[in-house]
Amino acid sequence: IKREPEKVKVKLIEYYNDDTSYSKEVLNQMGKANSATMINNITQFEPRLKLLMDQIFECLKDGRKILVLSDRRDHLKDIFYQMSLQEEFTYGFYLGGMKQSELQETETKDVILGTFTMASEGFDCKYPLNTIILASPKTNIEQAVGRILREEESKRKKIPLVIDIADNFSVFSRQKLKRIKYY
């Protein structure tokens, strides 16, 4: 983020694994990268999920309020399941199709699990968020990152933190470079 480093921290985690269930470049009939299939592979890869969970728990132990965003609901369900194995922290979904009362209940949780779509469509959390974890590859993140910058600077208890898990293969390497330019 093109701001002073003491106002926002960015933790870029470059991730790669040569296991083909994760890193195989899949092409469509036109010979172009099939991002949708590859994102499915990325979000279903257990070692990457473990890294993601480690980041979530590290932030929670630091007293952070976290928004975890993914393009895949199944990915969020996997994270939800991992969160359910502990009892110390609260967590909930913020997804399309949920009742307003359920969304408001989720806003009170330590960890909000949402889709990029929901975070960009009128997401207005009344409780200040200070951490966003980009759990699946994405190019345009400006609006999502803005969700942790809403609290007035003088009222912040923590410096806002962006954790970007950057997949280092195929089209995702280029997406990472676009995000770095934004930061």
Q: Predicted segment positions?
A:
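Helix N-cap/beta->alpha junction signal
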Residues: 71-73, 115-116
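Short, high-confidence coil segments that cap the C-terminus of an alpha-helix
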Residues: 63-64, 89, 109, 128
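Post-DEXD/H (motif II) to motif III coupling segment of the RecA-like Helicase ATP-binding lobe
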Residues: 1-9, 183
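Helicase-core coupling region on the C-terminal RecA-like lobe
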Residues: 7-29, 41
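Conserved RecA-like helicase motor-core motifs
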Residues: 65-67, 80-101
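Conserved RecA-like P-loop NTPase helicase motor core
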Residues: 96-182
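Short, aromatic/basic amphipathic alpha-helical patches
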Residues: 79-86, 175-183
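Conserved interdomain hinge at the start of the Helicase C-terminal
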Residues: 25-71, 78-82
